[in-house]
Swiss-Prot record:
Name of the protein in its database record: FAD synthase
SUPFAM superfamilies referenced in this protein's UniProt entry, alphabetically: Nucleotidylyl transferase
UniProt keyword annotations, A-Z: ATP-binding, FAD, Flavoprotein, FMN, Nucleotide-binding, Nucleotidyltransferase, Transferase
EC number(s) from the headed UniProt entry: 2.7.7.2
Keyword Transferase: yes
Keyword Nucleotidyltransferase: yes
Organism domain of life: Archaea
Subunit and partners: Homodimer.
Gene name per UniProt: ribL
Cofactor dependence: a divalent metal cation
Binding site for ATP: 11-12, 16-19, 94, 121
GO biological process annotation, one example: FAD biosynthetic process
Record GO terms (molecular function): ATP binding; FMN adenylyltransferase activity
Pathway: Cofactor biosynthesis; FAD biosynthesis; FAD from FMN: step 1/1
Amino acid sequence: MTARRVVATGTFDILHPGHVYYLTESRKLGDELWVIVARDENVKHKPRPILPEAQRLAMVSALRPVDHAILGDHTDMFCPIDDIRPAVITIGFNQYFDEEKLKGQLAERNLPAEVVRIGKYEDGDLASSRMIVQRIVEARGSGDQRIG
């Protein structure tokens, strides 16, 4: 029997509980969780990653819910999905994907994957990389050496 594969994608810059929640919830949808980590040069919809792609990949690979982690393709985001052939593709609550458009693009490539948007992580006030960076800047900018 073929394993039910789930693909999750993201930048995963400065890992935080929101990322772990997204990947944990994604893993519940199948037998194997494959994570595609965005390449540095492909992150265009938000500030460039602070951590280089190899380091982000290593961090994601070390997380318990993750069975396989790979870097995305340099030019075509669907190439790894063509190879993995997932049953499900998950999208984070704040990822810039139109689910219907994505379903259409998958259908054009004969990839009948279900598309599922994972909800927002609600526990804690530092559940985004942006908020973590902001807290660090505020703490260091004020001369306070503590972060917390």
